[in-house]
Amino acid sequence: MGAEWELGAEAGGSLLLCAALLAAGCALGLRLGRGQGAADRGALIWLCYDALVHFALEGPFVYLSLVGNVANSDGLIASLWKEYGKADARWVYFDPTIVSVEILTVALDGSLALFLIYAIVKEKYYRHFLQITLCVCELYGCWMTFLPEWLTRSPNLNTSNWLYCWLYLFFFNGVWVLIPGLLLWQSWLELKKMHQKETSSVKKFQ
């Protein structure tokens, strides 16, 4: 088996940490989603995982980047970002665009995810306003993470290895495009349904 197909200890540890956060997100989402429909249970699982990633992984990344950089840091979280940095070197050495986007992501997106969890569980009227806002912010974060790099012919991206290209870059980032897109579609359908219901009610009294 070629070297590009080998899964090292660093990669295994990082993937186990991500899997642990996913398991925690699933457990929290299912617990909070008791009595909810399947779509909302799925949304809660995603939002719990989303919040955990923003606060437990990206929050420490921002701190490490502001006091120094990931390359010169030690610890479990630093090791995870060093591993991801093999696919995208901007996460290892201080990159102003990445750090700026991540500050916004941690502070705004993480907080919005928590507020949205509350809004879904408590069936608040502002649920879809928060959902649309969060999804747009997540998509904007992905856009600003990769478009500047693509415009400069991706000098920091390593696509020569299947793990780095398809798992780290494509899958882990693609999830933050696919699921916010699905949640935007859910909000669109719910707002359309509410508008049709309100319109039909008004017509009955005319």
UniProtKB/Swiss-Prot annotation:
It comes from the Eukaryota. It is found in: Endoplasmic reticulum membrane. Keywords: Endoplasmic reticulum, Membrane, Transmembrane, Transmembrane helix. InterPro entries: EBP, EXPERA. The chain crosses the membrane at residues 10-30, 42-62, 101-121, 165-185. One of its GO terms (biological process) is sterol metabolic process. Residues 39-184 form the EXPERA domain. Its main location: endoplasmic reticulum. One of its GO terms (molecular function) is cholestenol delta-isomerase activity. The keyword Membrane applies. Coiled coil: none annotated. PROSITE patterns: EXPERA (PS51751). It is a multi-pass membrane protein. The keyword S-adenosyl-L-methionine does not apply. Widely expressed with highest levels in liver, lung and kidney. One of its GO terms (cellular component) is endoplasmic reticulum membrane. Homodimer. Does not possess sterol isomerase activity and does not bind sigma ligands. Belongs to the EBP family. This is Emopamil-binding protein-like. It comes from Homo sapiens. The lineage of its organism: Eukaryota, Metazoa, Chordata, Craniata, Vertebrata.
